[in-house]
Amino acid sequence: SPADVTIIIHPVNDTPELSEIGDQEIYEDEIFEYILTAINVDDDQLFFNATSFSEDIGVKVADDTLTITPNANWNGAADVTVTVSDGFLTDMEVFTLTVRPVNDAPAAEDVAIFPSVPLETHDLELSYIYTDIEGDPESGTEITWYKDGVELEEFANQLTIPSSATLCDEVWHATVTPSDGTDVGEL
């Protein structure tokens, strides 16, 4: 006599597959954004996450958008681990984000003219502190002197105005435009 056999095939949860990200590059002071994708034959809801052991970057995932924010003026490489999960099974990828350096503009700080209350017999001395985050040397900094609001080209790039060029009741000021030979800072 014939026998009937019935089998029931139960679905198996398949691991979601994270789409390849690959190594990525950005420039210093930029934010990296990437839309994460994955394949899931079971049509399960997927959850993305990302982490990094580097203290030089901030990593966040909102829905399927990965955002990496490097610290200001930082450049270098950081490994990032991205995972996708259906709540039970997980796939992951580790990629390297390389942050390329850019030349930052230098700054002139603590700009001052001494003495602050000069007499007609005093030379005027300009002082400032040159700073550059990369440590580039000062090259091509421009100094502009003004007397009573009028630029005096004969004293361009001079740190000292001799007392013979000043008179009582004149108003003097100076601007410093710092330069590292490539970029110039703000006045």
Identify the residue ranges that each predicted region occupies:
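Pro/Thr/Ser/Gly-rich low-complexity, intrinsically disordered linker/stalk tracts
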Residues: 109-119
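PAS/LOV and related PAS-like sensory modules
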Residues: 17-21, 108-111
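Acidic, turn/loop-rich segments in luminal/extracellular domains of secretory-pathway
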Residues: 1-14, 22-104, 119-186
